[in-house]
Amino acid sequence: NGNLIQIIENPQSDILGENYVFSPLKVAVDYADRIYVIAQNQFEGIMAFDAEGNFTGFTGTINVQITTAEIIWRKLSTKAQRAKQQLFIPTEFTGMEIDSDGFVYATNVDAEGEQSVRRLNPSGEDVIQKGAAGVSGDILWRLTGDYSGASRIIDVVVREKGIYSVIDSTRGRIFTYDHEGNLLYIFGGIGSQEGTFDTPTAIDTIGDEIIVLDGSKNLVDKYRATNYGFLINQAVGLRYDGDEASAVECWKQVLKLDSNFELAYVGIGKSYLAAGENKKAMECFKTGNNRQYYSIAYKRYRNEILKENLTGYLTAALVLIILLVLWNKIGKKKWKERRASHV
């Protein structure tokens, strides 16, 4: 009932250093009461504490990748030039949430727009599925002008059936993905009209509704799914539970509202693939622009055709062999008869 159990402050560890100042920004707790903290100016990763509040180390450190060109340039540049160059230090996390399996979904700012969301297993390894276009918000953006640059993903909320949503503070948009990293839908934006944000700072859910905190407007916006969004969520959830047949019916309803929604065709195609209807699956994957599953369906369909016609091919080959044997025997017999007539 809101009783204070424990206060965690100033964790002590050799890896933190003597003068470390603990400035927690965000906190999350998993099913085993392990505590995860994003702390200010903490680049080593997310701080982890056990159920008793003891600091146990870091998880999910983001290693900065240095390209070969950057390494060569740093070797060739002068000391003054190197001093002006950006330091290659790990990136801070900006938001996190823990799913029902104990995996930590964490967001970070990535200027390149390549990976702004991670799903960390208990070992701290990123096991997130990125889909065809990644899970970092916008895949195309302007380099100059207002709202330029990659999406700045600052927070994440985990929803039901493997669905999760992230919020971009650059353009104020919310991106929702399924557990495979497929983009489901986008909404929101920067503006003054209803349904837009000034400075979105956090995202969460209450039941089936999404709530977003706006730091400048000092208010909380609440969103409820439209029929279109509801059908997509339902289709993804049914497939997540293994109910492919029911998911197909939902995808068909989605296509009535948006005939260009590629993921719906892919969802229907996967159902056909599971049912062994490979030709129909190929058609759906082609329309859904999914080369990976199209190749799988094509190989299965090719094997299916070969198997169906194998008996015919073997029969034709057997008949041909018999004819060749008979022809050979008849030819030998005639040759012997001619030879005997000449003697």
Report the location of each language-model feature:
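Eukaryotic scaffold repeat domains enriched in small/polar residues
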Residues: 1-278, 285-289, 295-343
